[in-house]
């Protein structure tokens, strides 16, 4: 359980009472001891600055079928760097696209690297934005981490975050906001998720970590002649490594932390932001090697040299190290922006979110009787653990957006039908229950977005095992609104809108079918659908 902030309690003796605090681990209660503890912490800080900083060691994540699938689709990159004269050093962490150094929470290193650093940098490079200027220009690594960690403090792989950004999108820090480590929070708000959809990975790239020439070319100009280069993410063990924080040898970039020995335990993902060919390193046999990558860690600016250290090329080319101690592959991305054609706006109340997944389908034939072929969203897919929709200790109700653009025609037509599946499966230790509170479809194909309510089902609707289906036919919503008077007993049963289909006779003697839905809480308005 996370620590909760508590009020300080006065003490009548000389003992120092400590109370849990969810940020630092304790509150100092006794005023008489504060000065001495402050001096102790200052001394501890000074000592830590001259030593290797350590964190909790997380085990290597399991390579799941999904991870293998993602890796099978990554594009391998190898370029000929002979035709380009590379500078002696490149440091992409110094340009405006790179965000401030991250101090990660828990086992989120892979998402801090892939989303917090690499994706943020690449989107800003694409859009020519300053990452430090606004939280709108930085992407929330906890958004992806909490979609991928099964509601537990555990690690994952960088490519999982990239794939989520490719298939769904990525939320900004501004929209995501703050989140405690053990909340595993999902944001709520249709607009936030809609904005996340716009920022996408175009392709996930894979590099041979021993191909130093290709890696340097990517860091220099993204292997395509760009004015600035890209970033790389990689993994290594980090518990027990040796880093010399007083390196004073040759360099062009001026950092003073140099990794001299790999770790033996603890999986950790980090980001390569540049290189320096002048750095010198002596291997265990005393042989000197030139050149090192510049690594930016996610342990705050107080780690290493302002969060950065040199990692000699030699460790990647020595071939004596396993993939556990140092990865033989690195990843990068090319990014793009995306405009959805149609998006479902969903409000749902549910108490065990990993039961759920959300699928969409599109038809133009008006067929509502046969089951459509659903395409399921990458986000929210049996994810987030046995927690309420917003997270542990948070609310059951959430408003989200699901892209419904797959297969949608460029122009709208009267026969268009958009289908939504809310699929419930028994995942985890707890099978939840809840209701779909509201469903609508926002169509972006015209000059302005138009929102169409779901009138095919009475809402709220209980989420049942299997698929709870909804559909929206925009033509149903394009009728004029009329104020009508009718006796409630005709369409209300036991205090709720009847789900029955009524037959009505029109002025010209024809018979039409009519259904009611979405009655307001005060009973003064409702939707009428007829055909």
Regions from the PLM with identified roles:
Residues 3, 24-26, 38-40:
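Aromatic (phenylalanine/tyrosine) cluster motif
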Residues 29-37:
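Bacterial N-terminal signal peptides that target proteins for export
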Residues 42-49:
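Hydrophobic h-region of N-terminal signal peptides that target proteins for export
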Residues 51-92, 343, 446, 461-465, ...:
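N-terminal zymogen propeptides
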Residues 54-57, 105, 111, 115-119, ...:
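Predominantly the structural core of cysteine protease catalytic domains
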Residues 73-170:
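Substrate-binding/charge-relay-adjacent region of secreted/lumenal peptidase catalytic domains
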Residues 484-531:
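Surface-exposed, beta-sheet-biased, low-hydrophobicity segments with strongly acidic/polar composition
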